[in-house]
């Protein structure tokens, strides 16, 4: 699972996920990519599940880059616990995704196979995404 080795603070405030991606919206490594169309939150399990499904489909040929990293802790209180007594313990690690952010990039496989693999991966994600190529890289959506 993806998570930071160490953080300055254990817990973080919730915050708001508004606006568009100001970084990570162009292709940097691969030829084809998966780009977020709407805002959402992705956790380490979802990233790993999508990565495994895409990697299995391309039969470990080519290369996949994960362009997101869950560095924000989400807390949760235990079940059947009364309110109060402080903030809960860290439950999972997430990253806020804004529209336009690239999630995965892929290279070294035929485009049709890459599209099929990324389609399998996008079904594992909790927000709408689309598949883009190098020509479409500069568009936000």
Curated annotation (Swiss-Prot):
<protein>
    <recommendedName>
        <fullName>Large ribosomal subunit protein uL16</fullName>
    </recommendedName>
</protein>
<keyword id="KW-0699">rRNA-binding</keyword>
<dbReference type="InterPro" id="IPR016180">
    <property type="entry name" value="Ribosomal_uL16_dom"/>
</dbReference>
<dbReference type="InterPro" id="IPR036920">
    <property type="entry name" value="Ribosomal_uL16_sf"/>
</dbReference>
<dbReference type="GO" id="GO:0019843">
    <property type="term" value="F:rRNA binding"/>
</dbReference>
<comment type="subunit">
    <text>Part of the 50S ribosomal subunit.</text>
</comment>
<keyword id="KW-0689">Ribosomal protein</keyword>
<dbReference type="InterPro" id="IPR000114">
    <property type="entry name" value="Ribosomal_uL16_bact-type"/>
</dbReference>
<dbReference type="InterPro" id="IPR047873">
    <property type="entry name" value="Ribosomal_uL16"/>
</dbReference>
<dbReference type="InterPro" id="IPR020798">
    <property type="entry name" value="Ribosomal_uL16_CS"/>
</dbReference>
<comment type="function">
    <text>Binds 23S rRNA and is also seen to make contacts with the A and possibly P site tRNAs.</text>
</comment>
<dbReference type="GO" id="GO:0000049">
    <property type="term" value="F:tRNA binding"/>
</dbReference>
<dbReference type="Pfam" id="PF00252">
    <property type="entry name" value="Ribosomal_L16"/>
</dbReference>
<dbReference type="GO" id="GO:0006412">
    <property type="term" value="P:translation"/>
</dbReference>
<comment type="similarity">
    <text>Belongs to the universal ribosomal protein uL16 family.</text>
</comment>
<keyword id="KW-0694">RNA-binding</keyword>
<dbReference type="GO" id="GO:0022625">
    <property type="term" value="C:cytosolic large ribosomal subunit"/>
</dbReference>
<keyword id="KW-0687">Ribonucleoprotein</keyword>
<dbReference type="GO" id="GO:0003735">
    <property type="term" value="F:structural constituent of ribosome"/>
</dbReference>
<keyword id="KW-0820">tRNA-binding</keyword>
